[in-house]
Amino acid sequence: MNIHEHQAKAVLKSFGAPVAEGVAIFSADEAAAAADQLPGPLWVVKSQIHAGGRGKGKFKELGSDAKGGVRLAFSKEDVVKNAKEMLGNTLVTHQTGPEGKRVNRLYIEDGADIATELYCSLLVNRETGQVAFVVSTEGGMDIEEVAAETPEKIQTIDIDPSTGVTDASAAAVCDALKLEGQAREDMMGLAKILYTAFCEKDMSMLEINPLIVMDNGHVRVLDAKVSFDGNALFRHPDIMELRDTTEEDEKEIEASKYDLAYVALDGDIGCMVNGAGLAMATMDIIKLYGAEPANFLDVGGGATTEKVTAAFKIITADPNVKGILVNIFGGIMRCDVIAEGVVTAVKDVGLQVPLVVRLEGTNVAKGKQIINESGLNVIAADDLDDAAQKIVAAVKEAN
């Protein structure tokens, strides 16, 4: 689960991280009052959407010469003017896609005198199984660009879970960021704060870009992006309260009601699979044969007919879907349950696109019988390779 920048900063501040004072607003009328609460004379007006690249982004409704989603204001009048321009409009960044995201809230923040911009993030290093700091002296820009153009400027420091952040590992972070004096002293403490927050709140990613050194030598969290492990949210009702469903894909929200692992993608072949590994392999082989998956969807091992029906309806609700591949290897999951769910869903919503079904495993004969006797126009496949080729060919033929 993702949260907004102002929420992420509030979480980090509760652990002792240095952040600027700020106020979240939802209407232009609140902008002047927010500015009054902050000392000035510089304010920063920030669009709050679940996407990066806001500063370089552009609003659809404004001219090409209009400012982006993060703006400096040198008077309270400027704060109000920017708020009126930004709220309710659609911000397009490199992470939102061309459709952009509507800005429903802003964060008015006290400005800072920036001497140096750095990059600092925490995530789980899948190679070592440890939480790691990923840091760079190249802050304030897209870390993807740094990784592509100058990867040597990114350093990873793994943290031993049995010790947490020691003075030695905190010093390694400071060395990688080339910090000295007051900034180094601040970062020694901040590294421990960030690690504690990451672990205690079950975060999956914590990104600070930029982490700044101010003119007075102190460090400050200037921007913060936090994602939480969805499987651990039951332990954090305070974090659950921060969820903003207006920032989420409607299909993903619907999928969460049925405990379906669903992620919307940009392709045109819908996928319904059991098991995350098989789902990823299915997506890979679709790409191998020249097409793009429209989603990741794992129905899990204990799916019911109702759950499968819901999954199928979610896939067909995507207007970009031009074909559907159902790929089931039944171990815990029974093929007849999948078949019943598919048949029920198709009869409910109608089937306007090609459908390829590959079933193997528990009750496979019964599952195939259910589909064959349904009277539906379903293309049967014997294995994953055969299924991928058939759905790609069927979509090309239909379009």
From Swiss-Prot:
Cellular component annotations (GO), alphabetically ordered: cytosol; succinate-CoA ligase complex
GO terms of biological process kind: succinyl-CoA metabolic process; tricarboxylic acid cycle
Stored InterPro entries: ATP-grasp, ATP-grasp_succ-CoA_synth-type, ATP_grasp_subdomain_1, Succ-CoA_synthase_bsu_CS, SUCC_ACL_C, Succ_CoA_ligase-like_bsu, Succinyl-CoA_synth-like
Binding site for ATP: 46, 53-55, 109, 112, 117
Recorded metabolic or biological pathway in which this protein acts: Carbohydrate metabolism; tricarboxylic acid cycle; succinate from succinyl-CoA (ligase route): step 1/1
PROSITE patterns xrefs: ATP_GRASP, SUCCINYL_COA_LIG_3
Cofactors, names only: Mg(2+)
Domain spans labelled ATP-grasp: 9-254
Residues at which substrate binds: 274, 331-333
Binding residues annotated for Mg(2+), in chain numbering: 209, 223
Catalysed reactions, as listed in the record: succinate + ATP + CoA = succinyl-CoA + ADP + phosphate; GTP + succinate + CoA = succinyl-CoA + GDP + phosphate
EC number annotated for this UniProt entry: 6.2.1.5
Signal peptide: none
Entry keyword set: ATP-binding, Ligase, Magnesium, Metal-binding, Nucleotide-binding, Tricarboxylic acid cycle
Pfam families associated with the record: ATP-grasp_2, Ligase_CoA
Source organism superkingdom: Bacteria
Cofactor note: Binds 1 Mg(2+) ion per subunit.
GO molecular function, one term: magnesium ion binding
Annotated function: Succinyl-CoA synthetase functions in the citric acid cycle (TCA), coupling the hydrolysis of succinyl-CoA to the synthesis of either ATP or GTP and thus represents the only step of substrate-level phosphorylation in the TCA. The beta subunit provides nucleotide specificity of the enzyme and binds the substrate succinate, while the binding sites for coenzyme A and phosphate are found in the alpha subunit.
Record PANTHER family: SUCCINATE--COA LIGASE [GDP-FORMING] SUBUNIT BETA, MITOCHONDRIAL (PTHR11815:SF10), SUCCINYL-COA SYNTHETASE BETA CHAIN (PTHR11815)
Family, similarity comment: Belongs to the succinate/malate CoA ligase beta subunit family.
Subunit structure: Heterotetramer of two alpha and two beta subunits.
Protein name from the UniProt record: Succinate--CoA ligase [ADP-forming] subunit beta
Gene source species: Maricaulis maris (strain MCS10) (Caulobacter maris)
Gene name, Swiss-Prot/TrEMBL: sucC
